Structure formats: C-alpha cells, structure tokens
Amino acid sequence: MFEFARFPRFALRQLTQVAAVASALFAMAPTQAATVNLGAYLSCRHIQLTEFPGTIVDAAIATPQLSTLVSLVIAADLTGALSGKGPLTVFAPTNDAFAKMPAALLDLIGSDPKLLTKVLTYHVTSGAADPRRNLIPTQVHTLQGQTLFLAYDADGASVNQSVASCKGVKTTNGTVWLIDSVLLPQFK
C-alpha cells in the first residue's frame, strides 16, 4: 500500500498541481485542451515575481518600456491612486502597445481627461490578479467598473486578447504585468 506520509512534500505539491491542470484540461472542449502546452504553462506559472522596493508608480517610472503609460497616468492625475494603499494589480501596456494604436484614437483618449481615466482604470484591479494561473478564463473587476478576462491558453498568459508577460513585478502596493496591447473598455 502506498504511504503518502513518506512521499516528499514537494512531490505531493507537484502531483497536486499536475492533477489540477489535468482536471481543468479534461473540463475543456477537446480542441481547446489540445492547444495548451502543459510544460509551458507550468514553466510560466512558476516564474517568480521580481521584487521592486517602491510603489506601482515607482516601478513604472523605472521601466523604460512604460514611459508612454507613465506620461498618461500623470496627465490623468492617477499617480496618487496608484501609489496609495493596495494591493492593486496593473496590466501595463508597453510603449509598443501604444504605438500599435491608431494615432487618432490615442490623441482622442489623451485629449479627453474623463476618457483617459476610464481607459487607464480599466487596466487596474483591486487585489492580486495573476493571468498565469487561469486555464479556465476568469473574470476580474477593474477600478473602472467593467470586467477583464484572465486566461492561460496556447498563446500564453492573457488579459482579454492581450498577451501578458509571464514575469510580473511585485511592488509595495501591488503587482504590475506587462501586456502587449492597450485594453479598451466598452464605451456607453
């Protein structure tokens, strides 16, 4: 008879994780399950967060790929909110993400303070959210009021249709995940 008490704890954790992933894969449609690379999922999931000694805003300022986002956060007067008490999760579009947007749309968003605030707060959730841990799409509520979908699929970790980095940055008041496109809320 197999004795779990003699089985190493780390092996039990790994076995438990594999069992959880397998059960999630079996719960999916066959074509969806076939597209998830289990090795890549487990590898991405186990990448440790980079520790940053400052706030979300400090981390963004220290990241050259986020200079466009930083300038928009300053323009929207959101530095105080993103430097305050957390935890918050920010899905941070890179400079390349903003460069992919049509210039007219970026100009429109940047010139309207209310619209800019709506777009930026759509990238922020209260609490800890990790896009690497969701084989089944999971909804999270944004500070803007609408929801985002976090998932891990054949393309890796994603937020809505945007690809998220497997390596996040943990700050004193939350976590920052780089994403490859700007998320746009539904405008009513």
How would you describe each model-predicted region?
Residues T16-A27:
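Bacterial N-terminal signal peptides
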Residues F2, Q32-K188:
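Mature, structured domains of secreted/extracytosolic soluble proteins
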Residues M1-A11:
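N-terminal secretory signal peptides that target proteins for export/translocation
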